[in-house]
């Protein structure tokens, strides 16, 4: 399984023509631990410029940076056009955005040391390399970035990981009653073992959905090999998550293997758990009741989003961003956020409308036309739109199937299938009485258990930031899901949404409050961890 995930998740390669220009190559390692590769055409001058390539995601089985980083799918073309080209392996694998801007700063400094200062810089990036490229531009650590070409970029940033988290939650809810169909780990943040975990993962998919055998056989016969129950569960997962069957194995693999790697890496999230769904409506009444609910500390969510969420502060850089229309790994909805953030005069988006889903399944001429359109724009030509890029592509290839950019394509509203709303209405009222220092909680749900509780938290005599539990009352579930107070036993954390401080008036703020539960010598107490203001 891991081999398939890696092969698909790595960025696609274009077939490029051979060139015969002589180049000088430099390879080495910077102080961050990242490897670099630089190629420079003979007689290169500063005015010829530099292209920096940012590669895509590398899976959890690749634990060390690549000592011979790729220069990208258009490297030969760029060299033939006179550009020098450089790439970093990055000092981290996986979601490498935590330190990639520093890695690329050192790459650029190494280029200046070995070759000279370029008058202009272009950045190209694919898949994860798209958000890496935006961080490069917004950090300002590389000067003179005049243009950027992004292929199927994860440009909405870290929030893309919520789709992986939601897929796992939905999969587990659909498959929970299927014997032997449990995923390799009980908790979404636990890292499965390399071999046993992969076998258990494939076995889970086969038992629940029949996907593995049916995909191996393929076609109508493959579909017939699935039982009616497997078909029903498979279609339900696909309908709710809105992904194509061809992406289910890959995307669920990211959720089960790559997401825990991100969470547990000591130089990334270091065990912090930023993923939540306490307020998420999955659009299916039964799934809403079955799905495991989780809350996340605001500081944990913030650390994830800081690595990285684009701001739109790109200076004078011009960007051409292309995407395939049916990409369900990095959804085309990523382009919506880019469009909302960046001035229209600096951004051209073109979507290749495809018959079969793919991640970055561009033709060579589509990539080349986007690149040459960007170069012309940077050199003083008119800003290209999708139709211009399509026309450029068709000039180079009479096969119209190799040029699929559609000016009329409408972008989805979001990169997220299930957007987060931390101010969603709640079942029950949570309040803090400032006169008595008492917290009253209504409809507290213990994750994974039936029923809810009404209770009060009374401050300890020794420490008014520590609370004891009193007046606990069990109440039967209402039969439908609503956003409510939540206790997470595995994290020993209590989540209190939309808490009011009494006396409370209509325009007063509400707070999402997070507390830590302890039971020492039979004394149950809660300590305040964090809080955030809601916007309702």
What are these regions (language model features)?
Residues 45-46, 107-127, 144:
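Gly/Ser-rich "nucleophile elbow"/oxyanion-hole loop immediately N-terminal to the catalytic nucleophile
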Residues 154-309:
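Accessory cap/linker subdomain of secreted extracellular hydrolases
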Residues 22-44, 292:
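N-terminal cap/lid segment of alpha/beta-hydrolase-fold proteins
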Residues 329-333:
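Conserved alpha/beta-hydrolase "acid-adjacent" motif
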Residues 320-323:
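Short beta-strand/loop motif that positions the catalytic acidic residue
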Residues 47-57:
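Short beta-strand element of the alpha/beta-hydrolase
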Residues 120-176:
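Primarily recognizes the serine-hydrolase "nucleophile elbow" in alpha/beta-hydrolase
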Residues 206-208, 225-256, 345, 355-424, ...:
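Alpha/beta-hydrolase-fold serine-hydrolase catalytic core, especially in secreted/extracellular enzymes
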């Amino acid at each position: 399984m891991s081999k398939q995930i890696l092969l698909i998740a790595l960025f696609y390669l274009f077939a490029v023509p051979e060139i015969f220009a002589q180049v000088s190559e430099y390879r080495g390692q910077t102080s961050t631990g990242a490897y670099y590769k630089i190629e420079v055409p003979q007689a290169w001058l500063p005015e010829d410029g530099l292209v920096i390539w940012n590669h895509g995601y590398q899976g959890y089985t690749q634990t060390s940076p690549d000592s011979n980083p790729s220069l990208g799918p258009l490297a030969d073309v760029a060299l033939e056009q006179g550009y020098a080209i450089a790439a970093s392996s990055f000092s981290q694998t996986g979601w490498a955005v935590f330190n990639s801007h520093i890695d690329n700063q050192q790459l650029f400094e190494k280029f200046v040391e070995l070759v000279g200062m370029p008058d202009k810089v272009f950045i190209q990036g694919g898949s994860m390399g798209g958000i890496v490229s935006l961080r490069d531009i917004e950090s300002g650590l590389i000067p003179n970035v005049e243009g950027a070409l992004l292929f199927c970029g994860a440009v909405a940033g870290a929030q893309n990981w919520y789709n992986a988290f939601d897929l796992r939650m939905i999969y587990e809810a659909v498959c929970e009653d299927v014997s032997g169909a449990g995923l390799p780990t009980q908790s979404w943040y636990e890292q499965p073992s390399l071999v046993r975990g992969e076998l258990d993962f494939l076995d889970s998919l086969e038992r629940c959905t029949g996907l593995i055998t049916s995909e191996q056989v393929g076609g109508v016969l493959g579909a017939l090999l699935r039982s009616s129950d497997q078909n029903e569960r498979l279609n339900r997962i696909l309908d709710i998550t809105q992904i194509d069957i061809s992406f289910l194995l890959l995307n669920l693999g990211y959720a089960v293997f790559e997401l825990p790697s991100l969470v547990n890496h000591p130089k990334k999230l270091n065990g912090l758990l930023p993923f939540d769904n306490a307020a998420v409506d999955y659009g299916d009444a039964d799934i809403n009741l079955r799905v495991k609910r989780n809350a996340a500390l605001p500081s944990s969510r913030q650390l994830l989003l800081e690595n990285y969420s684009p701001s739109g502060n790109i200076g004078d850089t011009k960007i051409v961003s292309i995407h395939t229309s049916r990409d369900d790994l990095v959804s085309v909805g990523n382009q919506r956020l880019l469009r909302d953030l960046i001035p229209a005069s600096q951004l051209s988006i073109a979507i290749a409308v495809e018959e079969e889903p793919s991640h970055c399944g561009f033709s060579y001429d589509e990539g080349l036309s986007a690149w040459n359109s960007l170069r012309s724009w940077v050199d003083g030509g008119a800003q290209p739109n999708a139709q211009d890029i399509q026309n450029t592509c068709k000039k180079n290839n009479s096969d119209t199937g190799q040029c699929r950019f559609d000016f009329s394509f409408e972008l989805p509203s979001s990169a997220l299938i299930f957007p987060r709303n931390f101010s969603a209405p709640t079942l029950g009222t949570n309040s803090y009485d400032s006169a008595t220092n008492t917290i009253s909680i209504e409809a507290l749900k213990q994750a994974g258990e039936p029923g809810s509780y009404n209770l009060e938290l009374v401050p300890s005599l020794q420490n008014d930031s520590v609370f004891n539990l009193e007046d606990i009352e069990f109440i039967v579930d209402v039969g439908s899901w609503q956003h409510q107070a939540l206790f997470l036993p595995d994290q020993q954390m209590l989540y209190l949404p939309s808490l009011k401080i009494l006396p409370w008036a209509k325009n007063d703020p509400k707070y999402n409050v997070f507390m830590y539960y302890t039971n020492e010598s039979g004394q149950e107490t809660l300590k305040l961890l964090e809080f955030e203001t809601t916007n309702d």
